[in-house]
Amino acid sequence: MGAARIAPGLALLLCCPVLSSAYALVDADDVMTKEEQIFLLHRAQAQCEKRLKEVLQRPADIMESDKGWASASTSGKPKKEKPSGKLHPESEEDKEVPTGSRPRGRPCLPEWDHILCWPLGAPGEVVAMPCPDYIYDFNHKGHAYRRCDRNGSWELVPGHNRTWANYSECVKFLTNETREREVFDRLGMIYTVGYSVSLASLTVAVLILAYFRRLHCTRNYIHMHLFLSFMLRAVSIFVKDAVLYSGTALDEAERLTEEELRAIAQAPPPPAAAAGYVGCRVAVTFFLYFLATNYYWILVEGLYLHSLIFMAFFSEKKYLWGFTVFGWGLPAIFVAVWVSVRATLANTGCWDLSSGNKKWIIQVPILASIVLNFILFINIVRVLATKLRETNAGRCDTRQQYRKLLKSTLVLMPLFGVHYIVFMATPYTEVSGTLWQVQMHYEMLFNSFQGFFVAIIYCFCNGEVQAEIKKSWSRWTLALDFKRKARSGSSSYSYGPMVSHTSVTNVGPRTGLGLPLSPRLLPAATTNGHPPLPGHTKSGSPALQATPPAVAAPKEDGFLNGSCSGLDEEACAPERPPVLLQEEWETVM
């Protein structure tokens, strides 16, 4: 009863951080292409020029102050301040004249400098504006600075015919230090190696489950769909990175300067639906679809295990079709809706960045699957604890009981994606320094290697899979040994650990070529001179008595192991749920 009472409260407590910051989990792969950066700069320029016209048409407002312009600025409210002398050294004249006694002449006119929309500037003051958020790689917590001289003109750079401005706080992210570069290189290596290892191991796991017919059952079909979703997610990430990250501003961060940003802004605006966007839009769409299908197949695994535990009558074939439509079809619906809305209402850029509230078309279904799957995980762990307590009711070794529960929980965590909630309460935008590095290394490691862990637990460490591989290996080595002995003409051959010294020539009848005659080619046994009916064997006949045990064993063995193939699947379907449930317990325990 204790575990049953604690589990719902624990689920509610842990679901709160899941809902609060799962947005960062889903939206963590945004990247700005150079074309999108140009588009955003031109859009900011158009908005600035429109508001400049509105302000310049009111001369009275210009002579009063910049209050009207401050409210119309697109980049936030400007602030007039005197920064430190290192960045903005004051002239001797400014130092001698107190601020309150300075003449209030004509202010500096607002203008667009191809990076930022500057408001009216009070004469003799330093104007500070927040770094624009439409430049993706800027430090959005910093400020850019300009000085308005006492004559109502923006201060010029000495020796150059251009306006002085200080963007050093904004571009500090564009001049990466060696240590920061090493961190990103290390994260990229973890990211690439993790998804590569997952992709390779999942491919082997799918081939194993598809090759052995005795492993063809509903449980393993669901595992194969889950493995395939992890594989497609990894492939889509590699394709998206190859398409988007080539030619981004981030790749040229160390060479990017303020002048180059102005040059980008002065370039002609790209068309809204350029042909160059087709490839990256397709890559982003498939990435979002396979990301959603991966989350939904993780949910299908939880629903299947939950159904085996709590449903008395469970029709596997009927639910398999439903699970397939749910795992692959439902994500296709809301991704298609998102594509239609984005193409109609926000057909700009490469579609990789969020566009207002339209992002929730994809994020809400994914968040719902994460929350539901976590609730299923808590409920299944509760049942595990109850089962272990009932099994060890007469024993006093509670330490072993808790050890088994911990092991079972750790096995279920990679499948249900429980590791996502560790840093759920600290989104990317709220961490920095050491904590940010710890979070990024943790998420890159577990997210990329999750497919590998799932393949290890549900394929390579599965007892049924290991038994089939051992049987296949024994048959293959036996066939090679038999062929080698037959070619050498030896009088002995081995069958596993048993050695027979029977002559090879006495093994069975031979054909005219000297090869052993297959039992299928031997004449059929006759009854009163007539061959028996197909499928009929007379009771007590030598044929019935001589039937090897291995001929009848597969059906019974398959029934006990829950791995039906062919006609056997129908025969053992009514009794399979308890058997399958026992197998799932064995896998988890």
Curated annotation (Swiss-Prot):
Which family does the record claim for this protein?
Belongs to the G-protein coupled receptor 2 family.
Name of this chain's protein: Parathyroid hormone/parathyroid hormone-related peptide receptor
The segments annotated as topological domain Extracellular are 29-188, 245-294, 340-360, 426-439
What disulfide bonds does the UniProt entry report for this chain? 48-117, 108-148, 131-170
For membrane topology, the record states:
Multi-pass membrane protein
- Glycosylation is annotated at 151, 161, 166, 176
Alphabetical GO CC annotations of the entry are:
plasma membrane
Q: Which residues lie on this side of the membrane: Cytoplasmic?
A: 210-223, 316-318, 382-404, 461-589
Motif Important for interaction with G proteins mapped to chain: 473-476
Q: Where in the cell is it found?
A: Cell membrane
GO MF: G protein-coupled peptide receptor activity; parathyroid hormone receptor activity; peptide hormone binding; protein homodimerization activity
Q: Which InterPro entries match?
A: GPCR_2 (IPR050332), GPCR_2-like_7TM (IPR017981), GPCR_2_extracell_dom_sf (IPR036445), GPCR_2_extracellular_dom (IPR001879), GPCR_2_parathyroid_rcpt (IPR002170), GPCR_2_secretin-like (IPR000832), GPCR_2_secretin-like_CS (IPR017983)
The cross-references to CDD domains, in alphabetical order and at most eight, read: 7tmB1_PTH1R
Q: Which residues carry this modification: Phosphothreonine?
A: 547
Q: For bias kind Basic and acidic residues, which ranges apply?
A: 81-90
The principal location of this protein is membrane
Q: Which gene encodes it?
A: PTH1R
